[in-house]
Each structure stands twice: as structure tokens, then as C-alpha cells.
Amino acid sequence: MGGDIHLCSMILGKNHLIFLYFANLFGSTLSFLATIITIVFYLVKKYIQNKSFRENPHQYCHQHQYFDSSKLNEINNSGVGSYSSTPISIQNNNNKNNNLPKQKNNEKQPLINKNHNNYCNYSTSATSSSSSSSSFSSTNSGSSYEYQQPQKNQQTLSSSDKNNTIPSTNTKYEIELSIPQFKGNKCGPNCLLFSNIPQIKNALEQKKNPKKIDTLIFYLSISDFIAVSGIIIEQLIIIFNKEISKSIGFCIGERVSIHFGLLATLFWSNCIAYYLLRETYELKPYNIRFVYFHIVCWGMALIGVASLFFSKIITVSNIDQGGSWCSVSSSYQLYFWVIPLFVSFTWNLICYCLIYRKFNKIIGIYGIQSVQIKTIIIRKLSFYLLAFLITWVWDVINNSIFLYEGKCPPFALWILQEFFSSGYGFFNSLAYAVTTRFYSRK
């Protein structure tokens, strides 16, 4: 059976088209509002994080790595005579995310401390093989940090309350840390050290950026917004101005905008599934370059809609005495919508099963009482992938019936497809809101 599958819904529901319009418009309106909220929330959150980083950069060091200065005596008493290019490992018992980028060549691992509510003054000095010098200072909540880069060839690590020092040989980066007293009290066991080591700068820049999954959802929301905006405009024009809806220019314009947004939505959903799968099996955040995702998602969507400008791809079909529908050729619909939809649905289903299997093994080893495991399961397993599967399963069923049985699907399935497929942005935003709420409880 050839032709546009949507003509089936128009023919079957010619006496009840109001239900199709209402289901489609209702789902699109929910998605439109939800995607706007998601996009605005993401941008505001990113702005606040960037502003907070500019004003108080040390708070991101607090989240990055901590230094227990109670280990200082152990280092000094261990008889270490020089601080060579091999760093001294200082463990922290209070932080589970104590992971810095691996060192290269002769770069020493910096010591970064967390200090809560302490009015402390920190001073650091570092030198490199060159004769250049620089300075850095930051002030926040009564705490001041000062960074200088004089010309030195030796490094010492000292504490104001104990004359413990560690001499250093010539290395690429040489750091001096002094921990003074304040108001008769010691500064405390956790103190922050700023340095000019490139790994730390890169880590701090990454720390102030939103989570990668949030960024992926942001771009998914943009593609949803493009699609639902086209759907809403189309429905309103069909209802209030039927003359415009009969023109071929209108058909091409609204089909391009809707199809571009829907294709981009499928590809961004595939990228999210890929990211969650990699992060789950590696048990750590997966470092990605978003430029590749942009090329795949937006590029493939552009290729998909480019052929719509060729002749005989889109035609205006007359429905029931004066009504019209912008019909797409069956071959185009098969290759540029049905096949990508089936592939995306299968890929997301495979990722769902693999992640579910992985977490079943983890729960079997560590027990289901682990709060962290429960949170990860809720976040990664139950929302983003399920949102995709639930919303697009009706489209898959209807296209399967249309292609393999050669007949129009039941009208009730069309109602479900019109609502869920146009409401995909709403369910994505709902998943984003729920996971963000769980983040705040962690």
C-alpha cells in the first residue's frame, strides 16, 4: 500500500478529525511550553554557574580535589629529601571523587584543599624554567588567595605552626604553600592551593560547565522546539486559513521545519543513549567533543530534508470535499523517516536492555541498599530512554501495520500517535526535571 500513511488517519477519521487535531495540538502545546522552560532553565543555570565561577573560583576547587594536611607530618617524617618529578600521593578519606587528570612528564600533582568557613590567607609561589612572572588574586567571604610566580629554583612546603619543610629539586613547576594562623586558631586541616598548572586550569574550566547529560538534553529540547513550533503553526493555519494550507509553498515550508526537527530529535536521542551506555559501562563520565554530535545530528537532519525541495516529493492531496493535506511520497517517507525511526527505536531499546543488565550485576554484587546505585538507575535507566520508547512506540506500530499488512491502522492508535509523538518534548522535559530533582537530593 503506497502513499502517505497520514492519509489513512485523515480518511478513517474524516467525521472525527477534531479529535486528531486536538490530540496533536494538545501534545504540541505541552511540548512547546516544556521545551521553552527547559531551554531557559539550562541557560539561566549555565549563566549562574559561570558568574559564580568568576566571582568565587575556589569553590570549584573544593569540588575537584581535597588535601588532608594531617598527612603532612607523615611526609616530613618519612625522610624524603627531595620532591622529584614523581609526585607524593596524599590520600583523602573524605572525598570519593578525588580524580585529577593524569600527569605528564615532569609536572607535579598539585595539592588542593577544601576549607569550610575559615578566614584563612593562602599564598603560593611557583616558578618554571622561563623567567616570566605572573600574579593572581581572588577574594571571597573574608578569605583571600594570592598567587605569584617569582624566579626560584627550589620549592618548599611549610606550615606556620610547624617548621616542616620539603626541599625540592629543579622541576617544571615548583610550588610554595604557607598555611598561616588566624584569630589564634589554626587554619584547619583542609586548605586550598591555586597554581598555574595546566591540568588544574582545564579541570576548573570543565567543572564550571553544566553536566554533559544536561547539555545533551538542551540540544534535544532545541530540536523538539523546532518540530513542535512547525506543528503548531501548521495546525493553526489549517484551522483558520485553509486557502494558505492548499499552497505548495506552505506544504514545503511546514514539512521541512517539522521533519528537520523530528529527525534531529531522533539523532539527539540516539546520542543520549550512546552517552548513557558509555558512562554506565565505564562507570565514569564519558568525555566527549560535542562538535561530533552536532555534525551527526544537525548534519543528518539537513540531509534528510534537502530532498524535500525536489519535485514530486511533496504533493497537495485533497481530502473530503475541499480539505487538503501535504502528502509526502511513500519512498521518501520510507527512507527518510520510517527506517531512521526503526533504527533509532531499536538502538534505544538495545541500550535500555544493556544498561538494565549492567545494573542488575552491580546490584547483585553491592546490594540494592546502595543509595547511589538507586539514583543512577532512576536517572539513567528509567527516564530518558523510556521517554523515547513510550512516545515513539505508537508510530512504530502504525508504520508496521501500514507497511507489512497493507492497511490503515485503527483510528484509536492514530490518536495515541498524534498525542505522544507531538508530546515528546514534554516527556523529555519531564525526565529532565525529575533527574534534576534527584541531583539536588544527592
From Swiss-Prot:
It comes from the Eukaryota. The chain crosses the membrane at residues 17-37, 220-240, 256-276, 290-310, 335-355, 383-403, 411-431. Residues 112-122, 145-166 have a biased composition (Polar residues). One of its GO terms (biological process) is adenylate cyclase-activating G protein-coupled receptor signaling pathway. Residues 91-103, 123-144 have a biased composition (Low complexity). Keywords: G-protein coupled receptor, Membrane, Receptor, Transducer, Transmembrane, Transmembrane helix. The keyword Cell wall biogenesis/degradation does not apply. One of its GO terms (cellular component) is plasma membrane. Residues 83-166 are annotated as: Disordered. It is a multi-pass membrane protein. Residues 38-219, 277-289, 356-382, 432-442 are cytoplasmic. Residues 1-16, 241-255, 311-334, 404-410 are extracellular. One of its GO terms (molecular function) is cAMP receptor activity. It is found in: Membrane. Receptor for cAMP. Belongs to the G-protein coupled receptor 5 family. This is Cyclic AMP receptor-like protein B. It comes from Dictyostelium discoideum (Social amoeba).
